[in-house]
């Protein structure tokens, strides 16, 4: 057997996709393959694609075309491979393999088969696989932070969303498995663990018969990691038990990522959101009272088919009233294969864009005000990078999640991957600026 080929991975899409990328890297390294970050030097490039909305697919296609033009042997993995396997093979002769979301753990045998000249298609119709703490993993995040998947797939069928088709139904890992992986991450020096799944508040429902997020948080609270953050918490799943676990577990950050999508009950019904009209003022106020100082992030979809100006105004007033810390806004993307694709009264893109801009313009002064409230405080900051030109450190406080929220720009010296006290001296609508607090 000659020398094994070198492999690069181009990662696109969400942090769930990132974990798949990290497991593929871990499996390849364990099998003796060279992994290179430089795609030009690699024999094979694995493109872990995203297919969530049109813009994500366009980015995936651009990447694939660029690599094809460079005559690279391409292995297509991820959601787009799951979604469009036949078209991809037809249109990209450079693709030596297409691997679905439930099959990436077989990546080593895929490369071996491709090396023998086979064109490999490995796409399970219904993905059922989920990696655990025994699956090799090679992290690609900054050294202080790691994502930890507690479950994969989704049992809900929201009208606009194709994820259940791409990722399968929910399958949770056991509490023991998650704790074991968390301990491995802490041993690697991780300071912040971010729990992810499609619906984190439904964690455990499929294997325990009821959600077990509160028990999971308490179990993770016994691990020596400074920060545990949750993403994708449905407000209706934030039960008194879960809220108590957040309050009583010191290393669980009071950061709630609530994918609300809209405020108007009729729009929520059209979206087939699981709580229908129960997203209301009471739920948000209850959370604020139960967890004082909670940082609230949410996302909204504007321009859902049939959304009236009055319904959009309802959303504007809702955002104005509740003053979320962070808001992400997407315009509706009609996805073939979803019920919303065929709904009447699809809105023109310019109307959707204008509504997105109005909502973001409303949120900006709120975000600015929230950040101004941090000025003068000394806050804990996880230092993640150093700007090579200015020497400034860049990190995040507990208010900010990676990639989606702001950052803290810090003067002073500190070791990367550590959490240090920083005195905040100024802020804009996105970021904070501060100085390392010396211990003299």
From Swiss-Prot:
InterPro entries assigned: Elp3/MiaA/NifB-like_rSAM, Methylthiotransferase, Methylthiotransferase_CS, Methylthiotransferase_N, Methylthiotransferase_N_sf, NA-bd_OB-fold, Ribosomal_uS12_MeSTrfase_RimO, rSAM
GO BP annotations listed: tRNA modification
Transcription as UniProt keyword: no
Pfam family, any one: TRAM_2
GO molecular function term, any single one: aspartic acid methylthiotransferase activity
Ranges of residues in domain Radical SAM core: 140-370
Main localization of the protein described in the UniProt heading: cytoplasm
Gene3D superfamilies: Methylthiotransferase, N-terminal domain, Nucleic acid-binding proteins, tm_1862 like domain
A cellular component annotation (GO) from this entry: cytosol
Cofactor binding summary note: Binds 2 [4Fe-4S] clusters. One cluster is coordinated with 3 cysteines and an exchangeable S-adenosyl-L-methionine.
Top-level taxon of the source organism: Bacteria
Domain MTTase N-terminal: 5-116
SMART domains assigned to the protein according to its UniProt record, in alphabetical order: Elp3 (SM00729)
Subcellular location(s) per record: Cytoplasm
SUPFAM superfamilies xrefs: Radical SAM enzymes (SSF102114)
Record EC number: 2.8.4.4
Cofactor: [4Fe-4S] cluster
NCBIfam families: 30S ribosomal protein S12 methylthiotransferase RimO (TIGR01125), MiaB/RimO family radical SAM methylthiotransferase (TIGR00089)
Role according to the record: Catalyzes the methylthiolation of an aspartic acid residue of ribosomal protein uS12.
PANTHER family documented for this protein: RIBOSOMAL PROTEIN S12 METHYLTHIOTRANSFERASE RIMO, RIBOSOMAL PROTEIN US12 METHYLTHIOTRANSFERASE RIMO
HAMAP family to which the protein is assigned, alphabetical: MTTase_RimO (MF_01865)
Name of this chain's protein: Ribosomal protein uS12 methylthiotransferase RimO
Organism: Nostoc sp. (strain PCC 7120 / SAG 25.82 / UTEX 2576)
Gene encoding the protein: rimO
